[in-house]
């Protein structure tokens, strides 16, 4: 049985991602062929990269823990990658050939060593103005890229890749045990179905290597919080010429100091003086695209009233229609008054009381409370 990935990295099965990365970097530095003359350095370095490639991916790691080293390694060598995040093994796929043989199925066709690369996820935070206008962002991340020395074949230039003579290119051998036929990964080609006699020195026969990447991604106008944008073929490069995975950019929009977002509508709190509330008028309010517009305040506006500015909200993806901006009125009462202001308010107070006494509405309301 092969040494499992946790043993290769020297960590426990409960190790955190931080512990895994720390162990990987330490071992990769120790066994990198360019920094040591040890005979088994290249083999060890390849094992370390393979182990970390699986355990750093939560979905691959879960599948590895569930199915075990040998089954996982065999399934992955057959290209058992999923569409979202890499390896999503299906128990029916893994043991499908076993039950096919039990029911009288024939021998499988030769497998391909060109496993699809894993999908990648990148979290990108933008502000509300960027979400409104749309923006092009440069992002940086590390991933497996196609080897530019062997062009993804995994073999030195000019060297041919041959079909494994032990399994006939199937990637598996079969053992008859009584009534049952058990299939296991080929010991000679490790389930690849092919033999690389002279592996590429740069990628160690994998057809890909780890590299820091820079990529420009376009964020469309009107993007909403938690939107996922797919970039086909920008994920990890496949093994030995396999198709690349996809890159998924998950958008998070920062909270804004003024606006709250509700779909395509924007909400904001608008403070006005009690004089403007009583008499009405116009007031300038800021808008998301920049600048200000005039908002009409009707006479008699009350605290908590809501006034709407049509088509002054967020833009919508793939649409010319915009949401609205809804202003929530907050009437401010002055804390400090001049002598003249106080006199005017006292006069206003007297007139207000007289009006209520004359129309009887105030006394009728008070009377109803005690009846």
UniProtKB/Swiss-Prot annotation:
UniProt record, GO biological process: chaperone cofactor-dependent protein refolding; DNA replication; protein refolding; response to heat
Protein name (Swiss-Prot/TrEMBL): Chaperone protein DnaJ
Classification via PROSITE patterns: DNAJ_1, DNAJ_2, ZF_CR
Taxonomic path: Bacteria, Pseudomonadati, Pseudomonadota, Alphaproteobacteria, Rickettsiales
Compartments it resides in: Cytoplasm
Cofactor(s) the protein needs: Zn(2+)
One cellular component term from this protein's GO annotations in UniProt: cytoplasm
Summary of subunit composition and partner proteins: Homodimer.
Keyword annotations from UniProtKB, A to Z: Chaperone, Cytoplasm, DNA replication, Metal-binding, Repeat, Stress response, Zinc, Zinc-finger
Cystine residue pairs: none
Domain J: 4-68
A single GO molecular function term of this UniProt record: ATP binding
Record: residues binding Zn(2+) 1: 147, 150, 200, 203
UniProt cross-references to PANTHER family, sorted A to Z: DNAJ HOMOLOG 1, MITOCHONDRIAL-RELATED
CDD domains named in the record: DnaJ, DnaJ_C, DnaJ_zf
Any matching Pfam family: DnaJ_C
Function: Participates actively in the response to hyperosmotic and heat shock by preventing the aggregation of stress-denatured proteins and by disaggregating proteins, also in an autonomous, DnaK-independent fashion. Unfolded proteins bind initially to DnaJ; upon interaction with the DnaJ-bound protein, DnaK hydrolyzes its bound ATP, resulting in the formation of a stable complex. GrpE releases ADP from DnaK; ATP binding to DnaK triggers the release of the substrate protein, thus completing the reaction cycle.
């Amino acid at each position: 049985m092969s040494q499992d990935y946790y043993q290769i990295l020297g960590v426990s099965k409960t190790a955190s991602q931080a512990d895994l990365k720390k162990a990987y970097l330490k071992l990769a530095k120790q066994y990198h062929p360019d920094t040591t003359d040890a005979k088994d350095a290249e083999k060890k370095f390849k094992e370390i990269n393979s182990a970390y490639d699986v355990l750093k991916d939560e979905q691959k790691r879960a599948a590895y823990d569930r199915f075990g080293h040998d089954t996982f390694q065999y399934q992955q060598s057959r290209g058992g990658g999923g569409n979202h995040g890499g390896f999503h093994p299906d128990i029916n796929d893994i043991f499908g050939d076993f039950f096919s043989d039990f029911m009288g199925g024939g021998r499988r066709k030769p497998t391909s060593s060109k496993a699809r690369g894993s999908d990648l996820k990148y979290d990108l935070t933008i502000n509300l103005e960027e979400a409104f206008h749309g923006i092009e962002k440069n992002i940086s991340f590390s991933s497996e890229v196609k080897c530019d020395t062997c062009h993804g074949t995994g073999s030195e230039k000019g060297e041919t890749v041959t079909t494994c003579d032990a399994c006939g290119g199937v990637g598996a051998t079969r053992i008859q045990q009584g009534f049952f036929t058990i299939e296991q990964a080929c010991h000679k080609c490790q389930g690849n179905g092919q033999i690389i006699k002279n592996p590429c020195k740069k990628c160690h026969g994998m057809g890909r290597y780890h590299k820091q990447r820079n990529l420009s991604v376009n964020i469309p106008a009107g993007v909403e919080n938690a939107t996922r944008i797919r970039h086909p073929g920008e994920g990890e490069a496949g093994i030995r010429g396999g198709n690349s995975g996809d890159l998924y950019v998950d958008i998070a929009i920062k909270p804004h100091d003024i606006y709250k977002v509700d779909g395509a509508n924007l909400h904001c709190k608008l403070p006005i003086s009690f004089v403007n509330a009583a008499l009405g008028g116009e007031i300038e309010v800021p808008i998301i695209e920049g600048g200000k517009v005039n908002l009409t305040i009707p006479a008699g506006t009350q605290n908590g009233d809501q006034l709407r500015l049509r088509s002054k909200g967020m833009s919508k993806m793939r649409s010319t229609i915009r949401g609205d901006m809804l202003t929530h009125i907050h009437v401010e009462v002055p804390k400090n008054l001049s002598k003249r202001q106080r006199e005017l308010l006292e006069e206003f107070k007297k007139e207000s009381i007289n009006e209520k006494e004359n129309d009887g509405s105030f006394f009728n309301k008070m009377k109803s409370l005690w009846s």
